[in-house]
């Protein structure tokens, strides 16, 4: 049990947001006896890493809430699968099939992968599959199911009752042209199945019907049982109302929507949920990651190169700062995860609550000793030419005699990830430097220094000798350039490992031969 004084003191963001939620929603939570958090998913494209981030962060909030409160918690993962398909995603097959079904609800669009009854169902199943793989606890809800089953009917009637008030909230935020055509209700065309964005001529609150102008023809339809869906901002407010949501986080691009949805739920007679706006996920070019574009790194790619926990840690850090998500950030993210595990071993309870791995592992932090960084392991893959785990483990065991794959499961997984990442990402990017005459002379002096070293020497002693060699060969004023030269010649990169440690690990003789081969 965590001490109350430490729970009061911690400034870790999941605890800060959980305390804010309990403050703002106290009476509502006490009345219903549980805390309901929501995450949203638009299944117009495949689930991407940003989708994972929202569920992971909300789960961290739940973990904090469990320390602060005895109320049961629930995460609703809501899929907007009744939305119309507005454009064909770039990263799916059967593009023509999707073109033919534009503007239909996603659960009425055929599955281009030919596995499920609709494109919406396919993407929902992909979402559930990947959330399950991370062992998230969530309650999946489908917009189509809740509309068509009548679950939303009582709230839809309240929205129709407040039609004029809702229009007064939304209309001032629209351009003049859009003001003429806007309607909070989008009927599903009985002939084409399209989600129609057409103006309302008349509403019948008693019958729960609306009359539209459909290309000069009057169309009367019920707003109930899935015959209509709501425009986004009104739909979001309805969801909060009908599902009694206490908390939802959202990207900063939805801040304006959240303000309007808040006004709408307040108009309907309920208090809005507690909210949290996070910064967006960007690709390497700084562009927003999009489900339909498939840009940035995918979840599957990350999991080929690193553990789910390293991804969770990346999501934990600085949620209010924009994050670039692409392949090259993986090693740094993995090393930060390993470093946080190491730090946790010497931390007191309050410090642990501030450590990201406490939130990643919900307090059950692994106790495994971290043998080396992922970056170092990548250098070892390159220099050893190891193309399988067994071969790489041989090098590791030469340095650490008392370790085995079974006793070091995190490191064993890292070995596999390092081989895959090096071959897929790093290999093609390597640019090895050809040293000029003076640089070659300095590196030949380093070879002579290494020939005098032994494997019994400490990494610190070897590092000192490398420093001395650099100073004696023209790098006394800039040792940074000396190490940069070594890295560019040996590793094909401007940065590299601490050389004393690397040589101790890889072997003095092996490193000497490696350097000699590079100088040929």
What are these regions (language model features)?
Residues 48, 159, 307, 486:
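Residue-level signal for inorganic ion chemistry
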Residues 1-34, 47, 74-76, 167, ...:
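Basic, alpha-helical terminal appendages of large translation-related enzymes
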Residues 253, 258, 279-416, 491-520:
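Catalytic adenosine-cofactor/nucleotide-binding cores of aminoacyl-tRNA synthetases and other
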Residues 39-41, 77-79, 134, 142-144, ...:
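Glycine-rich, histidine-containing beta strand-loop boundary motifs that form or position
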Residues 136-299:
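Active-site cores that bind ATP or allylic diphosphates and position pyrophosphate for catalysis
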Residues 96-130, 134:
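A glycine-rich helix N-cap at a beta->alpha junction
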């Amino acid at each position: 049990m965590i001490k109350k004084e430490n729970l009061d003191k911690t400034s870790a963001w999941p605890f800060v947001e959980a305390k804010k939620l309990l403050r703002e929603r106290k009476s509502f939570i006490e009345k219903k006896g549980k805390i309901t958090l929501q995450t949203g998913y638009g299944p117009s494209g495949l689930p991407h890493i940003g989708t994972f981030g929202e569920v992971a962060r909300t789960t961290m909030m739940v973990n904090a809430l469990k320390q602060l409160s005895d109320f049961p918690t629930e995460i609703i993962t809501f899929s907007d699968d009744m939305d119309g398909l507005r454009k064909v995603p770039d990263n799916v097959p059967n593009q023509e099939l999707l073109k033919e079904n534009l503007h239909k609800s996603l659960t009425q669009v055929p599955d281009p992968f030919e596995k499920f009854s609709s494109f919406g169902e396919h993407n929902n199943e992909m979402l559930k599959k990947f959330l399950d793989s991370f062992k998230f606890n969530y309650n999946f809800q489908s917009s189509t199911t809740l509309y068509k089953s009548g679950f939303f009917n009582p709230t839809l009637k309240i929205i129709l009752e407040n039609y004029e008030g809702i229009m007064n909230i939304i209309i001032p935020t629209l351009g003049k042209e859009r003001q003429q055509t806007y309607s909070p209700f989008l009927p599903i065309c009985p002939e084409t199945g399209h989600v129609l964005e057409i103006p309302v001529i008349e509403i019948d609150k008693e019958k729960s019907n609306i009359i539209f102008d459909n290309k000069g023809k009057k169309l009367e339809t019920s707003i109930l049982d899935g015959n209509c869906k709501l425009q986004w901002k009104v739909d979001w407010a309805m969801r909060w109302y009908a599902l009694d949501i206490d908390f939802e986080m959202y990207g900063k691009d939805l801040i304006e929507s959240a303000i309007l949805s808040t006004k709408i739920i307040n108009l309907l007679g309920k208090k809005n949920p507690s909210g949290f706006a996070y910064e967006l996920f960007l690709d390497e070019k700084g562009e927003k990651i999009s489900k339909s574009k498939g840009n940035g790194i995918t979840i599957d790619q990350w999991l080929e190169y690193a553990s789910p926990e390293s991804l969770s840690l990346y999501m934990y850090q600085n949620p209010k700062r924009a994050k670039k998500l692409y392949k090259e950030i993986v090693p740094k993210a993995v090393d930060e995860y390993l470093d946080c595990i190491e730090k946790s071993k010497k931390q007191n309870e309050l410090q642990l609550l501030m450590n990201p791995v406490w939130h990643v592992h919900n307090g059950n932090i692994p106790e495994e000793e971290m043998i080396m960084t992922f970056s170092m392991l990548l250098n070892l893959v390159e220099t050893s030419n190891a193309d399988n785990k067994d071969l790489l483990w041989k090098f590791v065991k030469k340095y650490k005699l008392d370790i085995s794959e079974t006793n070091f499961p995190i490191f064993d997984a890292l070995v596999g990830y390092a081989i895959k990442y090096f071959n897929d990402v790093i290999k093609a990017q390597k640019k090895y430097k050809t040293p000029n005459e003076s640089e070659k002379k300095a590196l030949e002096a380093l070879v002579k220094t290494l020939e005098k070293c032994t494997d019994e020497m400490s990494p610190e002693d070897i590092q000192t000798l490398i420093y001395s060699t650099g100073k004696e060969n023209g790098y006394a004023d800039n040792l940074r350039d000396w190490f940069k030269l070594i890295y560019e010649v040996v590793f094909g990169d401007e940065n590299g490992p601490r050389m004393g440690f690397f040589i101790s690990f890889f072997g003095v003789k092996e490193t000497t031969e490696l350097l000699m081969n590079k100088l040929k």
